[in-house]
């Protein structure tokens, strides 16, 4: 398969190096287009008012891998690759392996997930991969899982382009309890802004905080007995959550239709 890889941790991240090398060794044609520096939590931001530069990178990856370091965001990387750097579209877009989980509402901020979502917007099935630790750097189990899942998808393709958001417990492969198809959970943070003063006496703020327990908020139309990604990770399961870019609140369509009197709203005073 022809694969396009990106991330938000940057071109020098061991996560993408492990993923790219593992997939190249499995015989895939691998292209890497990554930010040239750390770009975590940039969401789906794009660079509109500055030039985007891309430089070929040698000696970081498996010899068969073609790689570029891009000055833009993770979403810029995928857009640039599909629109300018590649001679043909890939079969799959992969983003990661991220250092740290992307669970529940994390995905709204995640550059990792946004890069993969950019592939889906272009009609290409995509995968976001995250290791659920900010300190453990053993990415091989997650890379092996991606390799094996791609082999399965090559024989049994997805019926439509979608994003598979995958989180892998930061454990040795033998200690991972299995794989679960999950629904997106909710992850809340207690945000704290630390007030500081720079050497010139100017005040600035540093965002900190801690993760709170997930909130049980079953989505209408989804089996509430199905584990959320947050719950499944607690049970040491690899999670696969299918995502889409259409954010329409479907039940809200009916609610608004019965609640709002649109003709009345359009009336103006004489």
Swiss-Prot record:
Cofactor: record remark: Binds 1 divalent metal cation per subunit.
The keyword DNA-binding is annotated on this UniProt entry: no
Family annotation (InterPro entries): SurE, SurE-like_Pase/nucleotidase, SurE-like_sf
SUPFAM superfamilies: SurE-like (SSF64167)
Binding locations of a divalent metal cation: 8-9, 40, 98
Family note: Belongs to the SurE nucleotidase family.
Official protein name in the record: 5'-nucleotidase SurE
Organism: Cyanothece sp. (strain PCC 7425 / ATCC 29141)
Taxonomic lineage from the root: Bacteria, Bacillati, Cyanobacteriota, Cyanophyceae, Gomontiellales
